[in-house]
Amino acid sequence: MPRAAPPALLLPLLGLAAAAAADCPSSTWVQFQDSCYIFLQEAIKVESIEDVRNQCTNHGADMISIHNEEENAFILDTLKKQWKDPADILLGMFFDTDDASFKWFDNSNMTFNKWSDQEDDEELVDTCAFLHTKTGDWKKGNCEVSSVEGTLCKAAIPYEKKYLSDNRILISALVIASTVILTVLGAVVWFLYKRSLDSGFTTVFSAAHQSPYNDDCVLVVAEENEYDIQFN
């Protein structure tokens, strides 16, 4: 039987799982779903939340926005495992006095919240939102902070890049699959060809060493020759 395709041919498949990671700007970013995250681990002095936001925009991102429980949990887990674990993270959120609601700086919809139990009648002008890293709850606080321990930024993966990445993975998978199939077929054909050659060589070799007469024929011929000699 032909041997299976060498494992080395399958090694490129291992790279497909990591292909999506290349969608983030660099290895210092962490990807989750359709976004990339980076925690700028440096304390900075600020006069307003815009100073914090500028830290993110300088990296082509914006302050963090959170849209579901899974993302909230991911941020908490990553803060503990990979980043310094500050007590609170400033969220990219502001209070819009025009319609008396909180909004994200990145203009995404407010589809999720994790507010801790607080009084609803508190003054919300100049109020910012913070993620408490120990509990995962959000809490309101004064935007006039003098410093922050670090800035958490988020950048969405562009649609074009995601689309190209998905197609690149599909094309790579098809190419690798085709290569493996052709390799296996080639191995089968080569095996059958070698077996055919070996079989033909054995047949010729056997025929070359086979006498055209058996023992009985040789004995009869010898007796006839002896009889002819006696009567001549």
UniProtKB/Swiss-Prot annotation:
Signal peptide positions (record): 1-22
Protein keywords: Cell projection, Cytoplasm, Disulfide bond, Glycoprotein, Lectin, Membrane, Receptor, Signal, Transmembrane, Transmembrane helix
Topology, Extracellular side: 23-168
Top-level taxon: Eukaryota
Disulfide linkage: 128-143
SMART domains: CLECT
Residue stretches spanning the membrane: 169-189
Membrane topology reported for the UniProt record: Single-pass type I membrane protein
Annotated InterPro entries: C-type_lectin-like, C-type_lectin-like/link_sf, C-type_lectin/snaclec_domain, CTDL_fold
Stretches of the chain found on the membrane's Cytoplasmic side: 190-232
Glycosylated residues (UniProt): 109
GO annotation terms (biological process): phagocytosis
Gene Ontology CC terms: cell cortex; filopodium; membrane; microvillus
Name assigned to this protein: CD302 antigen
Pfam families tied to this protein: Lectin_C
PROSITE patterns documented for this protein: C_TYPE_LECTIN_2 (PS50041)
GO molecular function term, any single one: carbohydrate binding
Known function: Potential multifunctional C-type lectin receptor that may play roles in endocytosis and phagocytosis as well as in cell adhesion and migration.
